[in-house]
């Protein structure tokens, strides 16, 4: 039996880890196409690029192959079904929200409904909720709601991606023929279909789901916690407006170019060091954040 070389094995192992970082390079010449519905001739252009380019890496060629496969895929192929949707009632009070954070909010974004799940009014971001729970002044859940978009299950995935970009939102509610809620799809779901598994936002909640301030210089955090949340805690800006990542995981992957091994330490600024404390070959799970200067205000999720 033929055995692959170590170099070939390492290439395969790192393939999925690095692919997301080729997207910006691949799409920069054609990103204007995503401002509207994706035209059919877009795919012929991509096919020619895939066939004729001699300068593309294996990762880039595979992403283009996945892009071509997405041509016929619809929202229905990847959506989270209604039965698996976690949502909160619009009338939920602050005490109930405190409990929901512990047991009912597994993701950074959670849907809000009025009356029944067929009447989704929007979604809240966990960072907005944390701020509101800290202040507790004139708390109204309605003030925290962000807009979502509506889509049919038959909508093509690339058309959905274009619409999400245009509307500047990451969540779409899928409706059935009667106007009821049929499912949910996030931009992460679409990107996973394009580049392979990024990190499953729909996994069971783990012990690392939020973050914990250990002391004035140390934070233990789930790698999926958003960078904006970390910025608020430490009082330091880590993300530029044009950066295309949202989470601590995205920050680390952008710095490293791959998924670093457990124990790897990354200096993301003069004041901040991030150490990988839990990871698998495909994604980061947990990190330890160490600050040379103390936190401006210590708080825990």
From Swiss-Prot:
Keywords on record: CBS domain, Repeat
Highest taxon listed in the record's lineage: Bacteria
One annotated GO molecular function: flavin adenine dinucleotide binding
PANTHER family assigned to the protein according to its UniProt record, in alphabetical order: HEMOLYSIN-RELATED, MAGNESIUM AND COBALT EFFLUX PROTEIN CORC
Gene3D superfamilies in the record: 3.30.465.10, CBS-domain
Lineage of source species: Bacteria, Pseudomonadati, Pseudomonadota, Alphaproteobacteria, Rickettsiales
Misc note: It is not know if this bacteria is hemolytic.
Span of domain CBS: 79-141, 144-201
Protein name from the UniProt record: Possible hemolysin C
Entry's family note: Belongs to the UPF0053 family. Hemolysin C subfamily.
GO cellular component, one term: plasma membrane
Organism from which the protein derives: Rickettsia bellii (strain RML369-C)
């Amino acid at each position: 039996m033929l055995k692959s070389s170590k170099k070939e094995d390492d290439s395969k192992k790192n393939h999925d880890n690095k692919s997301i970082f080729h997207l910006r390079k691949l799409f920069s010449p054609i990103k204007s196409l995503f401002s509207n519905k994706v035209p059919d001739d877009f795919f012929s252009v991509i096919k020619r690029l895939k066939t004729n380019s001699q300068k593309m890496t294996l990762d880039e060629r595979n992403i283009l192959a996945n892009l071509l496969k997405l041509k016929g895929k619809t929202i229905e192929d990847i959506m989270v079904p209604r039965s698996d949707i976690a949502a909160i009632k619009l009338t939920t009070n602050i005490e109930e929200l405190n409990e929901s954070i512990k047991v009912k909010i597994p993701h950074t974004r959670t849907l809000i409904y009025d009356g029944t799940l067929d009447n989704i009014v929007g979604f809240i971001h966990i960072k907005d909720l944390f701020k509101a729970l800290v202040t507790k002044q004139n708390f109204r859940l309605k003030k925290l709601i962000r807009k979502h978009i509506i889509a049919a299950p038959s909508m093509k995935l690339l058309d959905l991606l274009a619409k999400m970009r245009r509307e500047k939102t990451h969540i779409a509610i899928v409706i059935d023929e009667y106007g009821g809620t049929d499912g949910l799809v996030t931009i992460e779901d679409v990107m996973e279909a394009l580049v392979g598994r990024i990190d499953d936002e729909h996994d069971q909640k783990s012990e690392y789901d939020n973050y914990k301030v250990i002391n004035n210089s140390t934070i233990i955090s789930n790698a999926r916690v958003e960078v904006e949340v970390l910025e608020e805690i430490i009082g330091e800006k880590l993300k530029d407006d044009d950066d295309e990542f949202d989470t601590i995981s995205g920050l680390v992957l952008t710095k490293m170019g791959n998924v670093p091994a457990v124990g790897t330490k990354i200096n993301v600024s003069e004041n901040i060091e991030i150490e990988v404390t839990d990871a698998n070959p495909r994604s980061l799970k947990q990190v330890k954040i160490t600050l040379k200067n103390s936190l401006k205000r210590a708080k825990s999720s």
